[in-house]
């Protein structure tokens, strides 16, 4: 049975109260969903899933009653500690039971171009690994690189910088095709598979590769049979409990919820 990793990136949507409500309601609905879909229990139990609330809402996770639901941070500081107002370190995140951290997300790179690049992301990755938080390293080629046929070169260059002196068996790679953001154009499963296979070739077949790009409960099954894909980084589709439950029960056998 193939294991899938499903991480819901909540971006800047839920308030602290809404986050508390999600964890409370999720515990109830998760139990109901399992009871109503016994055919999916083996897949749910085999999968790994979590959510990434906003930084100020991470401690709401203390009310979570579903141990299988892991906590992910949307970002972290490249520095260990010091006079860095507004920053949150890996050491701090470890102390509140954060299991995963997004590193180098495309939106961070886009809106913070002076500070978010491969070099700063590399430092975040090293901090994450040091404090036993699994970094979810976001990479992807630009439209210019894609149009010029430089996808492989772009991915290779990113990985060379991001994984320098990093234990690759302690990381997850998330492929975000930058060229598709805001264009209405999404990559085909074949394109996702090609890049996923490339990432495995450049790293190791044991490194989990996720796909992040307008994934939802309606199209996720288009990607589940890709041999080199190991999971999904999901955006707005993870905000609603009913949709998220369908996402975390994803499997390559085509078994659907009732």
Swiss-Prot record:
UniProt xrefs under PROSITE patterns: TIM_1 (PS00171), TIM_2 (PS51440)
Active site: 105 (electrophile), 176 (proton acceptor)
Subunit structure: Homodimer.
Protein name: Triosephosphate isomerase
GO BP terms: gluconeogenesis; glyceraldehyde-3-phosphate biosynthetic process; glycerol catabolic process; glycolytic process
Binding residue positions for substrate: 9-11, 182, 214
Entry annotated with the keyword Protease: no
Enzyme nomenclature, EC number: 5.3.1.1
Reaction catalyzed: D-glyceraldehyde 3-phosphate = dihydroxyacetone phosphate
Pathway(s) the chain acts in: Carbohydrate biosynthesis; gluconeogenesis; Carbohydrate degradation; glycolysis; D-glyceraldehyde 3-phosphate from glycerone phosphate: step 1/1
InterPro entries in the cross-refs: Aldolase_TIM (IPR013785), TIM_sf (IPR035990), TrioseP_Isoase_bac/euk (IPR022896), Triosephosphate_isomerase (IPR000652), Triosephosphate_isomerase_AS (IPR020861)
Similarity remark: Belongs to the triosephosphate isomerase family.
Function field: Involved in the gluconeogenesis. Catalyzes stereospecifically the conversion of dihydroxyacetone phosphate (DHAP) to D-glyceraldehyde-3-phosphate (G3P).
A single GO cellular-component term on record: cytosol
Keywords per UniProt: Cytoplasm, Gluconeogenesis, Glycolysis, Isomerase
Subcellular location per the Swiss-Prot or TrEMBL entry: Cytoplasm
Gene source species: Mycoplasmopsis agalactiae (strain NCTC 10123 / CIP 59.7 / PG2) (Mycoplasma agalactiae)
GO molecular function: triose-phosphate isomerase activity
